């Protein structure tokens, strides 16, 4: 058993899109400084669940949520400060979504919005974030160039640097490599393994081999239910539930 502290605790979570019951009584404890992969077929609820962890679903008017999600023991749905939550819980999306500005300005954007104006402080944040995202050496001589001129894999690592610049404790990733080529995917995967020393990472992936490579724990979702959650090795070699076994062996999904 892991002796790491529980970072995210979810209890009896239900989510409805109008009358559609999209998540059903989800209970899960996500440990600090681990990579937790969410797997399952399309439409199973894994991305919907990911977006409950930083209240992204609040942006959809027909969504209703019941149950409790605690981050560091605090119920995030009883706290009105969503901006503080999204500072603590960063997000990286499926496709790189950089702003049409320089590499430097992309990474400095969040800190500037939060009132940091000192250039030396911003320079330090930008460099540290780009180093943490394993892309500093590739871009250090072109920080004033447009971020949109980078390759897809580089752009995604800039997106990760932009999330890191906000000094989060948790990073959510929604299929961050699905739009990337195999070499870029490998670089992002290597980066994720390094980042777990500093951050708690929750990643949605359709790629089961990726989940097996990069995660400590894996959660299998099906039809809005959390079917099984365990150490990744157990999920892939000795699953308890036949539905998990059927999915990972390719019998459906």
From Swiss-Prot:
EC category: translocase
CDD domains the record matches: ABC_PstB_phosphate_transporter
Organism lineage: Bacteria, Bacillati, Bacillota, Clostridia, Eubacteriales
Membrane topology: Peripheral membrane protein
The protein, known as: Phosphate import ATP-binding protein PstB
Enzyme Commission code: 7.3.2.1
Family indicated by similarity: Belongs to the ABC transporter superfamily. Phosphate importer (TC 3.A.1.7) family.
Catalytic activity: phosphate(out) + ATP + H2O = ADP + 2 phosphate(in) + H(+)
One cellular component term from this protein's GO annotations in UniProt: plasma membrane
Matching SUPFAM superfamilies: P-loop containing nucleoside triphosphate hydrolases
Disulfide bonds: none
Cellular location(s): Cell membrane
Domain ABC transporter positions: 8-248
Role according to the record: Part of the ABC transporter complex PstSACB involved in phosphate import. Responsible for energy coupling to the transport system.
Any one GO molecular function term: ATP binding
Leader peptide range in chain numbering: none
PROSITE patterns: ABC_TRANSPORTER_1, ABC_TRANSPORTER_2, PSTB
BP terms from Gene Ontology: phosphate ion transmembrane transport
């Amino acid at each position: 058993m892991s002796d790491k502290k529980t970072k995210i605790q979810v209890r009896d979570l239900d989510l409805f899109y109008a009358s559609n019951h999209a998540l059903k009584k989800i209970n899960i404890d996500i440990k600090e400084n681990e990579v937790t992969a969410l797997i399952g077929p399309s439409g199973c609820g894994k991305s919907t669940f990911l977006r409950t962890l930083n209240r992204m679903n609040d942006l959809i008017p027909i969504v209703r949520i019941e149950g409790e999600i605690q981050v560091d023991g605090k119920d995030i749905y009883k706290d009105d400060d969503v901006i503080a939550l999204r500072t603590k819980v960063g997000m990286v999306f499926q496709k790189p979504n950089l702003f049409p500005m320089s590499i430097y300005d992309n990474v400095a954007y969040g800190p500037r919005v939060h009132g940091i104006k000192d250039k030396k402080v911003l320079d330090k944040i930008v460099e540290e974030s780009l180093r943490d995202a394993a892309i500093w050496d590739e871009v250090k001589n072109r920080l004033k160039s447009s971020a949109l001129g980078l390759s897809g894999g580089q752009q995604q690592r800039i997106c990760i640097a932009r999330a890191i610049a906000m000094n989060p404790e948790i990073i959510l990733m929604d299929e961050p490599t699905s739009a990337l080529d195999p070499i870029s995917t490998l670089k992002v995967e290597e980066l994720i393994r390094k980042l777990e020393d500093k951050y708690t990472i929750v990643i949605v992936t359709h790629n089961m081999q990726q989940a097996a490579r990069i995660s400590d724990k894996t959660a299998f979702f099906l039809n809005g239910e959390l079917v099984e959650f365990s150490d990744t090795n157990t999920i892939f070699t000795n699953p308890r539930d036949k539905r998990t076994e059927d999915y990972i062996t390719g019998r459906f999904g």
